[in-house]
Amino acid sequence: MIGKNIKSLRKTHDLTQLEFARIVGISRNSLSRYENGTSSVSTELIDIICQKFNVSYVDIVGEDKMLNPVEDYELTLKIEIVKERGANLLSRLYRYQDSQGISIDDESNPWILMSDDLSDLIHTNIYLVETFDEIERYSGYLDGIERMLEISEKRMVA
């Protein structure tokens, strides 16, 4: 779906693969793989495409959305807020893990599992959001992580 939307955006702007690739700073071969769906598109590249072509994340990652332009804008703003909040929480999680001497290789540790899950959320899953309910669910998830961190940080200080 993302590849098809990138290809559609490129064609809308009447650009060749080479021209589009140069604008977003990738090779033509990479663009071809993204458009054909043989390679996954990084969230960083989605960010660049959205900025260079003034489109929303939903335009790139979502198809057949049933939102009017105002709702689309509101959803895009909420996605940005949740993404930024998630990044801040992830930073706090990493600091907490460091302060507790938790090894990043310990995949059985719940703090590592939580940070991996949060990283997936802010780097991938957030771009697949198509409804306000989904973004609210992610926001609630962030609330839970924040509460756990606050409790753990207070115990650490006490």
Curated annotation (Swiss-Prot):
Q: Which keywords does this Swiss-Prot/TrEMBL entry list?
A: DNA-binding, Repressor, Toxin-antitoxin system, Transcription, Transcription regulation
- Keyword Cell cycle assigned to the entry: answer is no
What drives induction of this protein's expression? Conflicting data is available; found to be a member of the pezAT operon (upon ectopic expression in E.coli); in S.pneumoniae strain 0100993 is found in a monocistronic operon.
PROSITE patterns linked: HTH_CROC1 (PS50943)
Question: HTH cro/C1-type domain location, by residue?
Answer: 6-60
State the superkingdom.
Bacteria
GO MF, one term, reads: DNA binding
Gene Ontology BP annotations:
negative regulation of cell killing; response to toxic substance
Does the keyword section mention DNA-binding? Answer: yes
List cystine links: none
The residue ranges marked as DNA-binding region are 17-36
What does the subunit section of this Swiss-Prot or TrEMBL entry state?
Probably a homodimer, forms a PezA(2)PezT(2) heterotetramer. The heterotetramer is much more stable than either of the proteins alone, and a specific mechanism may be necessary to liberate the toxin.
Under NCBIfam families, the record lists: antitoxPezA_Strep
Summarize the protein's role.
Antitoxin component of a type II toxin-antitoxin (TA) system. Upon expression in E.coli neutralizes the toxic effect of cognate toxin PezT. Represses transcription of its own operon, PezT acts as a corepressor, considerably increasing repression.
Q: What is this protein called?
A: Antitoxin PezA
The organism is: Streptococcus pneumoniae serotype 4 (strain ATCC BAA-334 / TIGR4)
